[in-house]
């Protein structure tokens, strides 16, 4: 497949998606079948209000979205996701126009939203959006003047709009990918570590906990007030949490809940 540098900007009308020009003449439903992982989260760098998501938010990065003929599913999708998705090709549009419509602006408003969000896209480039309609449920949130969309940045990478005026970069996962947590699985010794090393979802959440902890440390240092004591308190809190997590032993549901809650807690502390 020829690689196209296209634009991925979000919006969802009862679950819509937009895909890039390389899919313009193909069966997009077949081309995107498989597992995709959230690689990056983009938020408006000029927004001074308290955000729902932060840049590369650990709540979203690492989450897997499954596309198949009958559904679109994943832990970050609302309820049961999108049932019986269909893909409707839209007219070509520039990245700037697509982002303006998603934000509720006039299509030809002289904004530079691609730059404001730090998106890996060029505002003047043209993309071919595909709307994804769901027989029931939804994929992502609707934009202000356009539905949810997906476009191809390059082969194996998609961009789509998401909740709270954010955007997600999705990367295709190879078949039979091995779990890769934040620690070396060769050294896994406890039931908890072994469970994490045998499950891609748990391994992803383990990476997210590590990422969220790193963000919390950086935030404490950036504020530069009582840094030593706050870092000490954070470390104690993390060690206590690890003990609680290990009480789950190999219970996957318990581990998933513990890690999701910890990620949310650490991210909230960093806002």
Each language-model region and where it sits:
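Positively charged n-region of N-terminal signal peptides that target proteins for export
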Residues: 1-6
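Residue-identity detector for threonine
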Residues: 7, 94, 102, 126, ...
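Bacterial N-terminal signal peptides
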Residues: 10-19
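N-terminal alpha-helical modules
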Residues: 25-26, 31, 41, 47, ...
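Lipid interaction determinants
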Residues: 25-64, 106-177
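Contiguous, well-ordered beta-strand patches that form the walls/edges
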Residues: 43-44, 67-144, 232-235, 243-247
